[in-house]
Regions:
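Extracellular/oxidizing-compartment recognition motifs
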Residues: 40-431, 443, 459-460, 464, ...
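Solvent-exposed loop and edge beta-strand segments that line ligand/cofactor-binding
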Residues: 291-294, 362, 428-441, 482-494, ...
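Well-ordered alpha-helical segments within folded domains of soluble proteins
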Residues: 441-452, 461-462, 491-503, 568-584, ...
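Alpha-helical support elements that line or immediately flank enzyme active sites
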Residues: 301-320, 372-377, 442-471, 501-508, ...
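Active-site acid/base region of carbohydrate-active enzymes
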Residues: 169-179, 185, 371, 379-416, ...
Length: 809
């Protein structure tokens, strides 16, 4: 039965002339020994190690790869309300699961077919004695789907945890019907790299209403089609979706009203709209355009309730900011608060009214916006807007860090940074929520550090590390971003992945998790070793070796500048740092021989880099062996890697600040620049280095832009710019890890002109709290460490021991 079902499934997704081949392959696979499931949950072993009794189900007679929205329903009669009712749920592309009309789960968390996530949900709180309805909306955006959405075909699955709950297992007793009222709207109205999915066109005349309610009559719906049993990852014949439990919680969903109306053309609106639920009557044969302002960037599911208006067309368009003049200046943006004389373009949804009362449009997926433009064109029937609001969504991070000072600017920077970090964290970290929604390693390194310092929740970071590890290709490199259905390779991001893992090792108490990833690190470094010359330097490394969105007029640093011999100091320094990190981890929990090898390679690079790139006349490292290009990037890495130390490092750091001819780091790479300046002894100047963040604020941004050229920044929300949310705690308050797992704490504040500052941050054992107050010429210092944790205070050149609990100086 298992084999025939597998073949039936394959018949739905492969060309007919391939069936014989795959049947033969399945027979061969059946002879292989069964592998252990990748994870286990208490009292849940069976559904993790054997085929599920539930089937993947699909719309009947549907090819499975076309754009469409589908409803699945199952009636459930219960003699008593259960205390628990746990089920596992997944779908391709995505689902929303309802019990008796209440939304209970959204997913699946993004992954790939080798690690396809399912959510475990307790339905008991939503079930009643007697009749119940279990309903799901499943959608497939096909070729229009987001770049981050990997897919096989339209499908849905529910598996009960125990025999009592298996009554809900998906099979052909479930009903399924396509909603013919949906179509995709592609494009955002201007040329740019946009891969975050389509908008929706919903014709309410064709759409199915109230499909999730208990009393909905689905008797005429066809039965769902059974594909194949669900297969946990690791089974001998697992193919298609290899099911694994989601490692992250459900996303937050919180009501969020839109507070401000900026413009209204064609109508006079009643007071209160849209900040409160206020009905707006739009007369027949009228065109109305409303510009709504959330006042800050957000990500939310958008809901529009309306009545009447037979044949009326409504359009919701979403934008981070308005444009100066798209035809004349392209996507140039000015102050993000300005709307007069501006152009509006962006992702959009469109709705056609069927004229009945109580209609509702809910976006399938969340939208990112500060501004919404609502345009309504009525025909012969007036239309009433009953309500318009959002439901904020994001990874459920909690802010567990505090910073108090007499400088209100610091709190504003922290608030904007935290908003940026939250909007760039959903089921994965993302580079940006509006345009890409992709988890890039270079971005993720900084985002994970923000999570450690501000929240202490490391689940999304662990998930990111796992996804990066899963993405490795045969050559050894990670993909630059994952999940992503279009492979992109940035070797320099694979080197930053070594840093991501080293960061996790230093700040989180789970060395076994890190140890499990060391084979992947070896593969990455093995790849780079193939391009190392006799002296250790790199040459002709393939793919896209991205450094930063920086430039100096003669060179674009999205690729490293190389000299006549093909050398790049930046790449050599990154490789050297990766060897250093890997050597530390191998020495403590891996293979000692590899630790020795990596240290030797790092030492060789140290000598080679100094010979090839050091310019004695300038007292700086050049970007290439021709010594005709110099940057903050190369010299930041020189300090961080230990190429220069002590007074020499201080000299290099001062020149980086003073010499404007050096290629300047953008907001992204300032994460490394600022660490280098601190390491070189200039940390008391940290507050003087924040001009780009101040410019963002002055330009009306409520999140940090992608690049430092604010008028031409594509994305207004890139969390790689949220590094102050690390450095106000690590640099200013001085709290840092002093041993793997944050098992020891180093406190070395850099207060600059601040004389009254305090704060706290989460720690694996509790929290770290510090207070620095200057009275006259004397300082009062209080440092509280969590239980079973010790550390040191470095203050004015002296070192003092710290114990768990309160330490006063």
């Amino acid at each position: 039965m298992m084999m025939s079902n597998a073949c039936l499934y394959l018949e739905t997704i492969i060309r007919p002339h391939m069936k014989t081949f795959f049947r033969a392959m399945l027979t061969a696979f059946a002879l292989l020994p069964s592998m252990a499931s990748h994870a286990q949950i208490a009292n849940d072993h069976t559904v993790l190690s054997t085929p599920w009794n539930a089937y993947w189900i699909a719309p009947p007679n549907d090819p499975g790869r076309e754009c469409g929205v589908y409803y699945f329903r199952k009636a459930l009669d219960l003699s008593a309300k259960p205390s628990t009712f746990n089920v596992k749920v997944s779908a391709d592309n995505r689902y929303k699961l309802y019990v008796n009309g209440t939304l209970v789960s959204v997913g699946p968390a993004r992954g790939d077919t080798y690690y396809w996530n399912y959510e475990t949900v307790d339905l008991a709180p939503y079930l009643n004695t007697g009749k119940n309805s279990i309903a799901a909306i499943v959608w497939n955006e096909a070729e229009s789907r987001p770049e981050a959405q990997i897919s096989l075909r339209t499908a849905f699955i529910v598996q009960g945890n125990t025999a009592n709950e298996e009554i809900l297992n998906t099979d052909n007793s479930w009903k399924c019907l396509q909603d013919k009222g949906y179509a995709a709207i592609t494009g955002i109205g201007y040329p740019t790299y946009y891969v975050a999915g389509p908008g929706e066109l919903v014709d309410m005349n064709k759409s199915i209403k109230n499909w999730m309610t208990t009393d909905f009559d689905d008797h005429a719906w066809p039965d769902a089609e059974e594909l194949d049993h669900g297969k946990p990852k690791g089974m001998s014949d697992a193919f298609g979706w290899m099911l694994v439990p989601s490692a992250i919680p459900q996303m937050e969903r919180t009501l969020q009203r839109i507070p401000v109306l900026r413009k209204a053309d064609g109508i006079t609106l009643p007071a209160g709209f849209p900040a409160t639920q206020t009905a707006v009557l739009i007369p027949a044969n009228t065109t109305v355009t409303l510009l709504l302002d959330q006042t800050y960037l957000t990500s939310a599911y958008v809901r529009l309730n309306f009545s009447g208006g037979k044949g009326a067309a409504m359009s919701l368009m979403y934008a981070e900011a308005l444009f100066d003049n798209l035809k004349q200046f392209g996507s140039r943006k000015g102050n993000r608060n300005d709307v007069e004389g501006k152009d509006f373009a962006g992702r959009r949804d469109s709705i056609i009214s069927d004229g009945t009362p109580g209609q509702s449009f809910n976006t399938l997926y969340w939208r990112t916006f500060r501004y919404i433009r609502l345009r309504v064109q009525t025909k012969d029937d007036p239309l009433t807007i009953d309500d318009l609001y959002g439901t904020f969504t994001g990874y459920p991070f909690k802010l567990n860090a505090k910073f108090q000072s007499d400088n209100p600017e610091i709190q504003k920077i922290l608030d904007i940074g935290w908003r940026t970090a939250r909007l760039d964290a959903m089921e994965t970290y993302m580079d940006c929520p509006y345009y890409e929604q992709l988890q890039y390693i270079g971005d993720t390194r900084i985002q994970a550090m923000v999570s450690y310092y501000n929240s202490g929740d490391d689940r999304l970071a662990r998930n990111a590390i796992n996804l990066m590890d899963h993405s490795r290709i045969a050559e050894g490199l990670t993909l630059s971003r994952h999940p992503s259905y279009s492979p992109q390779i940035i070797p320099t991001f694979s080197l930053w992945y070594v840093g991501v893992l080293h960061d996790y090792w230093m700040y989180r108490p789970d060395s076994n998790f890190v140890k499990d990833k060391l084979p992947g690190i070896r593969d990455i470094l093995s790849f780079f070793s193939r391009y190392q010359q006799a002296d250790g330097s790199l040459k002709n490394v393939p793919y896209w070796n991205f450094i930063d969105w920086a430039g100096n007029g003669s060179h674009d640093y999205s690729h490293p500048p190389t000299g006549k011999n093909g050398g790049s100091s930046i790449m050599d320094m990154q490789l050297m740092m990766a060897y250093q990190w890997a050597a530390e981890m191998e020495k403590r929990m891996g293979m000692p021989a590899m630790a020795i090898l990596y240290k030797e390679k790092a030492d060789q690079l140290e000598k080679t880099i100094h010979i090839n790139y050091w310019d004695a006349a300038k007292g700086l490292y050049a970007d290439n062996e021709d010594k005709d290009l110099f940057s903050q990037h190369a010299n930041s890495l020189a300090i961080l890697s230990g190429l220069v130390k002590g007074q020499e490092a201080t000299s290099v750091a001062k020149k980086m600040l003073a010499d404007s001819t050096l290629t300047q780091c953008t907001i992204y790479f300032k994460y490394y620049l600022h660490q280098a300046l601190v390491k070189a002894g200039l940390g008391d100047g940290y507050l003087d280095w924040l001009d780009i963040w101040r410019k963002n604020i002055a330009m009306g941004l409520t999140t940090w832009a992608e690049i430092s050229d604010l008028p031409h920044a594509r994305s207004d929300c890139h969390a790689w710019g949220a590094s102050p949310n690390v450095e106000f705690y690590r640099t200013v308050l001085g709290i840092d890890s002093y041993a793997p797992g944050f098992s020891k704490i180093r406190i070395e504040p850099h207060l600059g002109a601040l004389t009254n500052v305090s704060g706290e941050m989460p720690h694996p054992n509790g929290k770290v709290a510090v207070s620095y107050k200057k009275r006259g010429g004397a300082w009062k210092i209080s440092i509280t460490l969590p239980e079973i944790t010790s550390g040191i205070l470095v203050w004015k050149g002296k070192t003092y021991p710290l114990k768990a609990g309160e330490n006063l100086f």
